[in-house]
């Protein structure tokens, strides 16, 4: 594993013209989407390809954050573990960035580490969020590549997503933005996406792309009514396994975008 402070090694990697791909995922309110991005990472994983998933802050499975690696000038390999599902796992910050925001210098350091890490992988997925003070993305590299916004099926989510997209546009300019609607069928998700896309076009001049919808596998009990059992599953409840298929569909759409999105070779 390389030393991120080794300038010669970094230059060799840049000269190699890596086609590493970076996909960042952000929650509708500018916050992380931890469990959701894990499922997407598993769906994105392909044979003979290496994938790195970077969480926003330290998880139980990640003993060392990249923030700690940078602070202690430690070997970068200490900040990466092999996940049982087959991808590599790391994390950016030591603590939740909502309560412990990073300094600009540290953001720059972490951005450099992630950029160099990407040369060892085919795909890098970053769980990003908006700074609560500057309202910019955690890493500048996230604004140079694909950004996926996760929103649920609600009017509140549409408003929150609009505010998040507004901040991203104001701070970073033209960023390729895609949307996934969770807790919804494809048709339901498309309806909410169209409403969000319409207001973003009208007021921000931003056009979004719909990646798909992710239903939930949990059964939803019917309301208690006279003469009916409360645990009867409503007809529109999603069947188990549909969630996994929906993630695969989103991963497939992301894969189709590969040839039209920038990579580190041109960043």
Regions found by a protein language model. Name each.
Residues 20, 49, 121-122, 174:
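Short, high-confidence coil segments that cap the C-terminus of an alpha-helix
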Residues 25-31, 54-58, 92-95, 127-130, ...:
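Structural motif
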């Amino acid at each position: 594993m390389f030393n991120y402070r080794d300038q010669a090694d970094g230059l060799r990697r840049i000269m190699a013209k890596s086609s590493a791909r970076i996909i960042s995922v952000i929650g509708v309110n500018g916050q992380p989407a931890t469990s959701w991005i894990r499922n997407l990472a598993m769906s994105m994983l392909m044979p003979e390809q290496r994938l790195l998933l970077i969480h926003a802050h330290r998880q139980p499975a990640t003993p060392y954050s990249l923030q700690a690696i940078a602070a202690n000038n430690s070997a970068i390999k200490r900040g990466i573990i092999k996940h049982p599902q087959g991808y590599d796992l790391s994390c950016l910050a030591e603590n939740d960035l909502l309560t412990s925001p990073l300094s600009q210098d540290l953001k720059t350091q972490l951005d450099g580490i992630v950029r160099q890490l990407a040369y060892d992988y085919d795909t890098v997925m970053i769980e990003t969020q908006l700074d609560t003070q500057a309202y910019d993305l955690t890493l500048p590299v996230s604004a140079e590549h694909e950004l996926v916004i996760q929103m649920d099926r609600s009017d509140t989510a549409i408003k929150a997503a609009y505010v998040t997209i507004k901040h991203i546009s104001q701070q970073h300019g033209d960023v390729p933005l895609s949307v996934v609607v969770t807790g919804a069928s494809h048709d339901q998700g498309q309806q909410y996406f169209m409403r969000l896309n319409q207001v973003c076009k009208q007021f921000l001049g931003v056009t979004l792309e719909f990646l798909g919808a992710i239903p939930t596998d949990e059964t939803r009990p019917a309301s208690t009514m006279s003469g009916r059992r409360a645990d009867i599953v409503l007809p529109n409840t999603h069947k188990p396994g549909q969630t996994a298929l929906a993630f695969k569909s989103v991963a497939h759409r992301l894969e189709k975008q590969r040839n039209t999105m920038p990579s580190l070779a041109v960043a």
